[in-house]
From Swiss-Prot:
Record organism: Rickettsia africae (strain ESF-5)
Protein name: tRNA uridine(34) hydroxylase
GO biological process: tRNA modification
Keyword terms, alphabetized: Oxidoreductase, tRNA processing
First-level EC class: oxidoreductase
Length: 247
């Protein structure tokens, strides 16, 4: 019986002084361990998704952690019968998730995590507003019942939406949500930087929430758009084939 291919996704906001220096080291260990995928490096941290044997993807992650020294890393592992990636790429970027706002230090300045098991109770409180930080085509596929849709085409439009909707956010506990956690984590840093104190985000994002809770209280409506060959998943994480992939 063939071993399943492990697909490891990981990100962390951590200050990396010279990210370009890490590229040859990560390419070397990745290729030696027959790992494929993409790792993005920036001064603000790393964001990667790569596939191989369970042992080897974890060895690459260990090297990434050793080289960058993060306090915490958000990690998720799935399995496949085949490699979803053709080769290993390690790329230098200005940001690991592009918001186009200078001066944010997400590592030091971000909102509080809400665990998936506590999310439903938290977002049904009267003084909480839920903001879905994903792009509009993702929100149209599915979102939380009470979530506000900023109707953005790209994440770079989100800061302008925040500036234009300060009355909506005033006096509220702000709960941010996104697919896997990275975008909503950076969003909390933006809001904290402009003076909002009570800012929160769903740990692990929508996918972790659906996995952990099975949407038992039916607060999630629709499906969750994902950027892989599944296109979208239902609330039990089963693939839905009718949604076409957008990047």
């Amino acid at each position: 019986m063939n071993e399943k291919i492990a697909i490891l996704s990981a990100y962390s906001f951590v200050n990396i002084e010279e990210p370009a220096n890490l590229i040859p080291k990560l390419l070397l260990i990745g290729k030696r361990k027959y790992v494929r995928g993409t790792i993005l490096l920036a001064n603000e941290g790393f964001n990667g998704s790569f596939s191989g044997s369970y042992e080897n993807v974890n060895l690459v992650l260990e090297e990434l952690i050793k080289l960058t020294g993060p306090k915490d890393v958000n990690v998720k592992i799935n399995y496949s019968d085949v490699h979803p990636f053709q080769k290993l790429k390690v790329r230098l970027k200005k940001e690991i998730v592009a918001m186009n706002v200078d001066g944010l230090n997400v590592d030091l300045f971000k909102g509080e995590y809400i665990e998936p098991k506590d999310w439903d109770e938290f977002i049904t409180k009267q003084d909480v507003i839920v903001i879905d930080t994903r792009n509009d085509y993702e929100v149209e596929v599915g979102t939380f019942k009470s979530a506000v849709n900023p109707n953005t085409k790209t994440f770079k439009q989100f800061p302008a939406w925040v500036q234009q909707n300060q009355e909506l956010l005033k006096g509220k506990k702000i709960a941010m949500v996104c697919t896997g956690g990275i975008r909503c984590e950076k969003s909390t840093s933006l809001l904290k930087s402009i003076g909002y104190d009570e800012v929160y985000h769903l740990k692990g994002g929508i996918l972790q929430y659906l996995e952990d809770t099975q949407n038992k209280n039916n607060l999630w409506q629709g499906e969750c758009f994902v950027f892989d060959d599944r296109r979208a998943v239902t609330d039990d994480l089963s693939p839905v084939e009718r949604h076409w992939l957008q990047r």
